[in-house]
């Protein structure tokens, strides 16, 4: 039964991590530089499932080391190498998450594939520095036990403590502190609300946005000396008044603007005929009626062409140079804010998933490293039974 369960775990580990590598390498949406951590982590887990777990299963089932003595030493070194690499990868991912949240603009500009690969190389070098000493310095191994050969980890106290601290306790402490810090940053960010993150509406309604683009678009809209106020909507039209209006000094040929600024109807309302198809007499009559709000199109092309859809909750201010869209939450700043909000949501979701992974990781690894370290601290009185170990 144990062999069947372990075999299923081996196959599941290989298949699942192979899918992770395949997804990152083939999907464009997953080709972000930080996902290289997942590729390297998945590779380390696949190596554990193929080179470590099968020999460990055979050793437990047979009760002795069936393979060569030299392979036992290499096997133990690879065991420490791959497991330490997997743990330090999780630590590096947590640090990457923290830097991306705390220093978003600065770190995201530096988060290049080259930089991520250098961090991954450093992770593997740390794992190698912890796993290779038993191969280089074997120390006093003592007499070999009689009977069938055994393959056991290094029992020297200095190596047990140093490898346990470097492989588990130090990375685990770093991950716990980092994710606690990320949680506090996310909590403080949620308390501030969207306005602290640059909510639309603070500075967006103060600057009009062009409605159209191209040669007929409004290039330089008139400058409003004072803020305009909306009096109210009557007969399907919104009347906008201001204390003072003046034209820009860049174009001396532009006539002086009248006191009442005509406003086009809101979305869903039909436009009146103003320029396209009007006779000179009709245009003159329209100019004489200065107190009545007029619907002036941006250009003859826009008046004769298909009706442009304007966003809901926005108004179009008609000027002598064209149309100016006074939007509520519409524009580049609003789009950037929503994109930033979606990005933060993804960051929080990813951080939550990684936190679950870290929790499972601690529950799985802590019993082994705790009992392994006790053998170096008090080998006589605190020794854990071999079956439990």
From Swiss-Prot:
The record marks 79 as: Implicated in ligand binding. It is found in: Cell membrane. The keyword Glycoprotein does not apply. It holds the Pfam family 7tm_1. The chain crosses the membrane at residues 1-25, 37-62, 73-95, 118-140, 157-180, 354-377, 387-389. Coiled coil: none annotated. Keywords: Cell membrane, Disulfide bond, G-protein coupled receptor, Lipoprotein, Membrane, Palmitate, Receptor, Transducer, Transmembrane, Transmembrane helix. One of its GO terms (cellular component) is plasma membrane. Interacts with RAB26. Interacts with PPP1R9B. Belongs to the G-protein coupled receptor 1 family. Adrenergic receptor subfamily. ADRA2B sub-subfamily. This is Alpha-2B adrenergic receptor.
